[in-house]
């Protein structure tokens, strides 16, 4: 067996709820070995969250939109916030920046329309790479969309390798801004291409919007508000 080099990777994620930046560190050979490091969350200010959401749009002319001054300004601010969050994270966890081999920078999705052949995440990866002096990988969804895919969800590959040594049938339910499911059987099938994974529908993004609009809260902490209601048995 070939011993693959292990890399220390720092990942940045800003989901469709547009509430902040998630940061995590892993040590991995990219295939069979994953060691999870520290992780943390850095919320957007209410004003910046509002600015981000103001540029969400499913259908748009990308050539024109990418030249819009307002979007460029928000992208620059967003990139700066990621840089600031990384520095806070590294300092808090006493991690030497020179130990980080690569940064995965998802960016903030502001337009996702695979049927029209695009998914657009703002975030200037070149600027971030120059600020950090670390290699930055971005545009994770682009190639899949250009080849007829949906560009989502992203997490199934990670789910597969994270549980590779658990010889069971496994289903992940990821309740993010958009919920998604990942299903595979490690008992009989070790083929990454046979993962069943798909977006299941809106989740926290719509709940957060409703809670903010009606109750002026950021989110339904611990599901306290939801527990006061009742569910529709026919739908369930």
Task: State the predicted function of each range.
Residues 1-7, 32-33, 91-92, 98-99, ...:
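Short, Lys/Arg-enriched, disordered terminal segments
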Residues 99-157:
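Glycine-rich phosphate-binding loop and adjoining helix at the ATP-binding site
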């Amino acid at each position: 067996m070939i011993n693959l080099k292990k890399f220390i990777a720092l990942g940045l994620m800003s989901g469709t709820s547009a509430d902040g930046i998630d940061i995590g560190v892993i040590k991995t050979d990219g295939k069979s070995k994953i060691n999870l490091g520290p992780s943390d969350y850095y919320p957007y200010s209410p004003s910046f969250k509002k600015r981000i959401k103001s540029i969400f749009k499913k259908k748009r002319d990308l050539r024109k939109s990418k030249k819009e001054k307002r979007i460029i300004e928000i992208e620059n601010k967003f990139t700066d916030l990621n840089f600031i969050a990384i520095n806070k994270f590294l300092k808090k966890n006493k991690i030497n920046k020179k130990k980080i081999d690569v940064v995965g920078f998802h960016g903030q999705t502001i337009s996702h329309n695979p049927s029209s052949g695009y998914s657009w995440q703002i975030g200037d990866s070149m600027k971030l790479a120059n600020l950090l002096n670390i290699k930055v990988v971005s545009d994770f969804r682009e190639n899949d969309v250009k080849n007829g895919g949906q560009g989502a969800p992203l997490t199934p590959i990670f789910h597969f390798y994270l549980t590779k040594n658990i010889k069971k049938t496994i289903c992940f339910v990821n309740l993010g801004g958009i919920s998604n499911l990942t299903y595979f059987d490690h008992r009989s099938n070790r083929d990454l291409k046979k993962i069943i994974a798909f977006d299941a529908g809106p989740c926290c993004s719509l709940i957060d919007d409703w809670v903010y609009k009606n109750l002026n809260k950021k989110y339904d902490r611990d599901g306290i508000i939801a527990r006061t209601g009742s569910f529709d048995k026919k739908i369930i």
